[in-house]
């Protein structure tokens, strides 16, 4: 009897368990399906989470993609990264109370986190990084998650103070809060974490002093507090007590003062990044006690003194970046003996003397850059002993002697820059056969001899040998350089004819062979090289006529054959070359009359001077003008009649099309609002603001309205022209995919969009002070004082820097200009208008475009020539904006003869008898400015000229620009530098 009762009881318990398990299983499935419905959003692809479907099977949900269950069929893990999803996290997430791992990163989820997350008390791993979550981070919902070990909220839109509730999570090991908008100081309580091993707070808007109490985090191994924060004071000396720390990143966060010698006590530290701050003083020799150190970056500071000799103890060092400081003295010989050193970058310092000849003997060197110092002597021969050296950069020094054969035969090299030295002798032939090299720059040296007859290299894009003593003929083997874009052989002693094979290169855009002893005609192949953008053959002894077919060169912008012996007539087909802005045919033997009309209207008489038998329309006698006037008038009448007839037909067609589109529009006027954050407004409110009296701007892509919402807020509404989707969406997709996802205080925030089948309306935060262009060139012109101009430059640079260096993939704006830098109520700058933006997946790579985009006067030369765009194209455009801030004039239209602002500045420098930086600035500075610090203007001017260098790779990065602008010389604020006009 007793056994029967026991059996019955067990059976009852089993059925109860089965019922509970069944209910829990179906409950988890229901929760997952509700998650799918909410998180997909309207913009997700149809196949997103396609296998998340209802089933009567108890275990079906355990086989959903990204879902894992325990033995009781309860969901314990969800990983739906990279789907992508565009909705929000619903309250039903709290029903998955057995969840241990929730990873929803790399999506486009928006809104605030639901309070129901607090029910996930078993959660150990929470990753919501790379989304668009906004608002204050709800620290209270984390408190019940007592098992939490990993919390990653990187790259979202969270604002407010750093939550202090995290400190109570005793098992938390990994806390990643960077890439948000957290502000205020780092809480002192953050020193109370019990188990924390990883803490990253970089790329926020933090301020105040770095708490010295963080040194109490004895379990911490990685600490990142840097980029885009703006702390006060310096590095806490107490950090030296963090003996477990292996990685410390305090880069680019406004730190000042000296480097504390006490940091040397961090014996386990392998990475120390202090670059891009305002650190001063000498490099503490005590740092040599950090025997585990592998990467040391002190670049972009104001450090002085010499490299400590005790650094010879750093046997594990692989990276030594000391560039852009005020270091002096010689490079100690022990640097060449560091057994693991791979990267040595010392550029822009005051180092002198000879380099140690043992550099590279460790067989590890990859990157070597000592540009802009005062080094002399011979080039070390063993730099490429490793066979892995990629960059050899020694420009702007005093090196002499030859280029060692060992370097010339280094097949791993990608960049060779040795211009502006005193190098001499023949260039080893091997340097012209390196398979991976992309740049060879040897200009302004004393090299001699002939170029080798055999030249090859599939990667070489820039070959610059200008201003040397090269002789002999230009080798036809240059045709083997199939990737060559820039060929500069000017100011040498080359002779013979120009080999026609040169112009068979498919990517050639810039050719400068001026200032040699070349003879013979211009090769007929010249007019077949349709990629050409700039050609300078001046100051030679060329003869013959200009080959026929010039009009085929549709990208040619500069053509200079002055001071030669070229004859024949000026090609009439030049009139059709709309890209040609600079033409110089002066001092030749041209005959006849200069053609008129078309592109010839752009050129002045200077372009044709010094040709005795050539006359212009002003100097040639009028011939039978009256005889032609009658027939021409009749012809004109016929043309006018035809135009009127065609116009009438066009109006009828347009009217019919208009009525058809109007009928279609009525069917498509269902507006829908999509917000990238919580918006307290409705689509109808936005549409009601599309009135003539609300227009605040017009452009090629659409009209911008000011919208006053019922809640009292103002928004900017950009109504895009054209259809709502498709290939010609006038930047709608580009804006959504770029500014819709990114967040930075100096990038105009896209709040959301309103759309129907015919029209897209983009909603932005309203900028009451308009654009920088309006303040410089409009009715408000001249009211910006220098301090405000400088502030705007720094802030706009930070916005672009974020696009280039903190977005993944990086974003190229492609239309940087003063009209796209908007100013809020406090005159803080915001980069705007991403309708032309493009993603670029590798920094330093380029992307080919089908046509030129951007604004005339701001477009980088290589972009206009090759249609290839990279982040350095934006740098050029920003340099033009800096010149606008200094000069106060538009980039084009004010300098005559197709000259832009960059060309005008260079021309002004050449015209000055003593062209110092100060003289140039005083000659070009905005006359409306008064009381400005001259040194500050000169400083920005020099940065601007770095940005607008003709060759893209020689321009600084936006990160370097930000650092330079943020760290002006102290003397720029001294009152004795003020200029009153």
UniProtKB/Swiss-Prot annotation:
Protein's UniProt keywords contain Kinase: yes
GO molecular function terms listed in the Swiss-Prot or TrEMBL record: ATP binding; protein serine kinase activity; protein serine/threonine kinase activity; receptor serine/threonine kinase binding
Membrane-spanning ranges: 639-659
UniProt EC number: 2.7.11.1
Span of the signal peptide: 1-23
Gene Ontology CC terms: membrane; plasma membrane
InterPro entries: Kinase-like_dom_sf, Leu-rich_rpt, Leu-rich_rpt_typical-subtyp, LRR_dom_sf, LRR_N_plant-typ, Prot_kinase_dom, Ser-Thr/Tyr_kinase_cat_dom, Ser/Thr_kinase_AS
Catalysed reaction, written as an equation: L-seryl-[protein] + ATP = O-phospho-L-seryl-[protein] + ADP + H(+); L-threonyl-[protein] + ATP = O-phospho-L-threonyl-[protein] + ADP + H(+)
UniProt keyword Cell membrane, yes or no: yes
Subcellular location(s) of the protein: Cell membrane
Annotated LRR repeat ranges: 96-120, 122-144, 145-169, 170-192, 193-217, 219-241, 242-266, 267-290, 292-313, 314-337, 338-362, 364-386, 388-410, 411-434, 435-458, 460-481, 482-505, 507-529, 530-553, 554-578, 580-602
EC supergroup of this enzyme: transferase
PANTHER family: PROTEIN KINASE DOMAIN-CONTAINING PROTEIN, RECEPTOR-LIKE PROTEIN 55
Protein name as catalogued: Leucine-rich repeat receptor-like kinase protein CLV1a
Organism: Glycine max (Soybean)
Lineage, opening ranks: Eukaryota, Viridiplantae, Streptophyta, Embryophyta, Tracheophyta
């Amino acid at each position: 009897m007793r056994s029967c009762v026991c059996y019955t009881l067990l059976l009852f318990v089993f059925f109860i368990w089965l019922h509970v398990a069944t209910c829990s299983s179906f409950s988890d499935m229901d929760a997952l399906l509700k998650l799918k419905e909410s998180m997909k959003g309207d913009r997700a692809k149809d196949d997103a989470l396609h296998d998340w479907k209802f089933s009567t099977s108890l275990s079906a949900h355990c086989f959903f993609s990204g879902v894992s269950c325990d033995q009781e069929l309860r969901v314990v893990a969800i990983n739906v990264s990279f789907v992508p999803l565009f909705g929000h996290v619903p309250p039903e997430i709290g029903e998955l109370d057995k969840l241990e791992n929730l990873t929803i990163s790399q999506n486009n989820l928006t809104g605030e986190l639901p309070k129901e997350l607090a029910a996930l008390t078993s959660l150990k791993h929470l990753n919501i990084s790379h989304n668009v979550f906004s608002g204050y981070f709800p620290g209270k919902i984390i408190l019940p998650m007592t098992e939490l070990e990993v919390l990653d909220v990187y790259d979202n839109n969270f604002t407010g103070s750093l939550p202090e509730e995290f400190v109570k999570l005793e098992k938390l090991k990994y806390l990643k809060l960077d890439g948000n908008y957290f502000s205020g100081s780092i809480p002192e309580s953050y020193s109370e974490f019990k188990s924390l091993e990883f803490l990253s707070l970089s790329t926020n808007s933090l301020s105040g002093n770095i708490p010295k109490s963080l040194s109490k985090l004895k379990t911490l191994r990685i600490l990142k507090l840097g980029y885009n924060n703006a702390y006060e004071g310096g590095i806490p000396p107490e950090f030296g007590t963090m003996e477990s720390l292996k990685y410390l990143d305090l880069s680019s966060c406004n730190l000042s003062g000296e480097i504390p010698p006490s940091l040397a006590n961090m014996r386990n530290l392998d990475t120390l990044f202090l670059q891009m701050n305002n650190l001063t003083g000498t490099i503490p020799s005590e740092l040599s006690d950090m025997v585990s150190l592998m990467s040391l970056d002190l670049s972009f500071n104001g450090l002085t003194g010499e490299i400590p000799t005790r650094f010879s103890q750093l046997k594990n060092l692989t990276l030594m970046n000391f560039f852009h400081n005020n270091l002096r003295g010689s490079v100690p010989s022990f640097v060449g003996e560091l057994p693991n050193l791979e990267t040595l970058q010392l550029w822009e310092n005051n180092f002198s003397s000879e380099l140690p000849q043992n550099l590279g003997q460790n067989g590890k060197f990859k990157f070597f850059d000592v540009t802009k110092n005062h080094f002399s002597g011979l080039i070390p021969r063993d730099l490429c002993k490793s066979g892995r050296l990629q960059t050899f950069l020694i420009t702007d020094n005093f090196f002499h002697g030859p280029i060692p054969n060992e370097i010339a035969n280094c097949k791993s090299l990608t960049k060779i820059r040795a211009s502006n030295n005193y190098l001499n002798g023949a260039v080893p032939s091997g340097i012209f056969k390196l398979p991976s090299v992309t740049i060879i720059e040897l200009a302004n040296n004393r090299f001699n001899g002939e170029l080798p007859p055999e030249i090859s290299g599939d990667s070489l894009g820039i070959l610059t040998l200008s201003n040397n003593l090269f002789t002999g003929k230009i080798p036809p083997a240059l045709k083997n350089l199939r990737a060559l874009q820039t060929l500069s052989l000017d100011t040498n002693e080359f002779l013979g004819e120009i080999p026609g094979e040169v112009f068979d290169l498919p990517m050639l855009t810039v050719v400068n062979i001026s200032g040699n002893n070349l003879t013979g005609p211009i090769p007929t192949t010249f007019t077949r090289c349709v990629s050409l953008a700039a050609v300078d053959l001046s100051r030679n002894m060329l003869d013959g006529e200009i080959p026929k077919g010039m009009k085929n060169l549709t990208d040619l912008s500069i053509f200079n054959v002055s001071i030669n012996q070229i004859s024949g007539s000026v090609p009439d087909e030049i009139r059709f070359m709309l890209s040609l802005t600079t033409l110089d045919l002066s001092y030749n033997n041209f005959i006849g009359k200069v053609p008129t009309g078309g592109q010839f209207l752009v050129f002045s008489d200077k372009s044709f001077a010094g040709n005795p038998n050539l006359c212009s329309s002003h100097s040639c006698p009028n011939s039978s003008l009256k005889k032609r006037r009658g027939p021409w008038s009749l012809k004109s009448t016929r043309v006018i009649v035809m135009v009127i007839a065609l116009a009438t037909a066009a109006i009828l067609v347009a009217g019919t099309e208009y009525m058809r589109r109007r009928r279609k529009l009525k069917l498509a006027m269902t507006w829908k609002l999509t917000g990238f954050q919580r918006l307290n407004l409705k689509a109808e409110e936005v549409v009601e603001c599309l009135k003539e009296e609300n227009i605040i701007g017009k452009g090629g892509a659409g009209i911008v309205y000011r919208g006053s919402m019922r809640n009292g807020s103002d928004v900017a509404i950009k109504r895009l022209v054209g259809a709502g989707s498709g290939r010609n969406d006038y930047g709608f997709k580009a804006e959504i995919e770029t500014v819709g996802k990114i967040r930075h205080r100096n990038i105009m925030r896209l709040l959301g969009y309103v759309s129907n089948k015919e029209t897209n309306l983009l909603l932005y935060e309203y900028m009451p002070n308009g654009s920088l262009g309006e303040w410089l060139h409009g009715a408000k012109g001249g009211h910006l004082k220098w301090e405000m101009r400088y502030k705007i430059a720094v802030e706009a640079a930070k916005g672009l820097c974020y696009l280039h260096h903190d977005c993944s993939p990086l974003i190229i704006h492609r239309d940087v200009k003063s009209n796209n830098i908007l100013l809020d109520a406090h005159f803080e700058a915001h980069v705007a208008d991403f309708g032309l933006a493009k993603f670029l997946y590798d920094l330093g790579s380029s992307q080919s475009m089908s046509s030129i985009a951007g604004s005339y006067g701001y477009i980088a030369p290589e972009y206009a020539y090759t249609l290839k765009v990279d982040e350095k194209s934006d740098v050029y455009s920003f340099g033009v904006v800096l010149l606008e801030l200094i000069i106060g004039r538009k980039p084009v239209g004010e300098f005559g003869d197709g000259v832009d602002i960059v060309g005008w500045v260079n021309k002004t420098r050449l015209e000055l008898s003593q062209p110092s930086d100060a003289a140039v600035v005083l000659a070009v500075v905005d006359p409306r400015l008064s009381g400005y610090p001259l040194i500050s203007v000169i400083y920005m001017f020099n940065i601007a000229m770095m940005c607008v260098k003709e060759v893209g790779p020689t321009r600084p990065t936006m990160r370097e620009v930000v650092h330079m602008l943020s760290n002006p010389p102290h003397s720029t604020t001294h009152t004795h530098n003020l200029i009153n006009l």
